[in-house]
Amino acid sequence: MRYDLSVEEGLVDFIENKALPDTGVSQDNFWLGLSSLIKEMTPENRKLLRAREELQDKIDKWHVARIGQPHDHEAYKSYLREIGYLVDEGESFLIETENVDPEISSIAGPQLVVPSTNARYALNAANARWGSLYDSLYGTDAMGAFDQAEGYDRGRGARVVARARVFLDNAFPIIGASHADVKRYYVSDKQLLVDDLPLVSPEKFIGYSGNPKAPNSVLLKNNGLFVVLVFDRAHVVGSRDQAGLADVRIESALSAIIDLEDSVACVDGEDKVNAYSTWLGLMKGDLTSEFEKNGKKVVRCLNSDLSFISPSGDDFSIRARALLWIRNVGHLMTTPAVLDSNGDEIFEGLLDAMVTTMLGMHDLKKA
């Protein structure tokens, strides 16, 4: 027992010995908080579910009473207003939320959804912030159907490189030249020069790594999204490129939802611990996954931030991981992992809200 709650032993062990340490939250405060939350919000949750059930019952009866009749849109809309399903639009207002992550407030990009019960999928999603344009073009039908030849197809690879240069010409045009003909990228007088020529929009050059005269990488930005040119003349691609360009990496999945709801089936405390463990590892930054690929052991972990030097010579870093969201279970489901003072299953969403917020404190304390 934890206060007036009956909690599955595995969940207790996870909360007290793995999750709470280093958060600054004591075991007593956590369980007291969960107990208080359940007492306060369970009646509200049930009230909402009753209201939903009543509305659904009225809507069902409307349709049953009109079986075989043509649909009357205006009458149906009027009925939905009458029962309170539809309400009048309110006055316009300004959102006052501050300190919102740019991935939410100002940058547009893809978002992934992955099950919280699969650490490998979660790592893939978190690391999907960056992707190789070369790999994406080569490995899909964007460049046409694959030939049957085994191994690296040089012809296809050449078409990929040419297509990537078209992208660079469109996003980062050079005054009087094309990226397809470039032999050298370097930094001089706080700007990127490409065969001694500047970009049409020099402000799109954000930074570089390595030697400014022969950088390892160049960081560019277009429409709010970063692009990294990777140079490596020892690389299989870079060795055949006159500028030594081995890859073009682009910002891809800006955010990812770690899902506790639709894509998982968590039926007891053991399942919840599995799901919460993934979120804990993501928040602490130490999540790993081991698997075999082509007969070799692979250990996957979270990517580290990317470091660069600004045009003015200052060191800075940018995010290498997607902004992570957590999707808790909604209002309907209950879980046997925790029973209230009456011996009833608690609403799973209340448990999720308490636990995932507490786990998120590991990340907040690192900031």
Which residues fall in each region the model found?
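Catalytic alpha/beta active-site cores
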Residues: K77-S78, E82-A367
